[in-house]
UniProtKB/Swiss-Prot annotation:
Component of the signal recognition particle (SRP) complex, a ribonucleoprotein complex that mediates the cotranslational targeting of secretory and membrane proteins to the endoplasmic reticulum (ER). SRP9 together with SRP14 and the Alu portion of the SRP RNA, constitutes the elongation arrest domain of SRP. The complex of SRP9 and SRP14 is required for SRP RNA binding. The keyword Phosphoprotein applies. Heterodimer with SRP9; binds RNA as heterodimer. Component of a signal recognition particle (SRP) complex that consists of a 7SL RNA molecule of 300 nucleotides and six protein subunits: SRP72, SRP68, SRP54, SRP19, SRP14 and SRP9. Residues 96-110 have a biased composition (Basic residues). This is Signal recognition particle 14 kDa protein. It is found in: Cytoplasm. It comes from Mus musculus. SUPFAM superfamilies: Signal recognition particle alu RNA binding heterodimer, SRP9/14. One of its GO terms (cellular component) is nucleus.
Length: 110
């Protein structure tokens, strides 16, 4: 997995979307990041220790290539604006789901 800066992550994410435009999927995950790269040992778990600054870890993959970035709380507004514009621009290939007729199954159970 490649850890990139925020701007580089957005450009690589755009490339992933362009590559998967005709066929394929891009999976994006977002989670809280505390700065650790190793797991916490079970016996000495530190529950009261909070990081000085909250961070978010974003990961994106198309199944073959993985990219990730860490966004600090100071730059989250700037990143979110650029990220939302990127998502709006690249989610034009979505298909509407076929809604099944629910009237057949709507009888109340007695």
């Amino acid at each position: 997995m490649v850890l990139l800066e925020s701007e580089q992550f957005l450009t690589e994410l755009t490339r992933l979307f362009q590559k998967c435009r005709s066929s394929g999927s891009v999976f994006i995950t977002l989670k809280k990041y505390d700065g650790r790269t190793k797991p916490i040992p079970r016996k000495s778990s530190v529950e009261g220790l909070e990081p000085a600054e909250n961070k978010c870890l974003l990961r994106a993959t198309d199944g073959k290539r993985k990219i990730s970035t860490v966004v600090s709380s100071k730059e989250v507004n700037k990143f979110q604006m650029a990220y939302s514009n990127l998502l709006r621009a690249n989610m034009d290939g979505l298909k509407k789901r076929d809604k099944k007729n629910k009237s057949k199954k709507s009888k109340p159970a007695q």
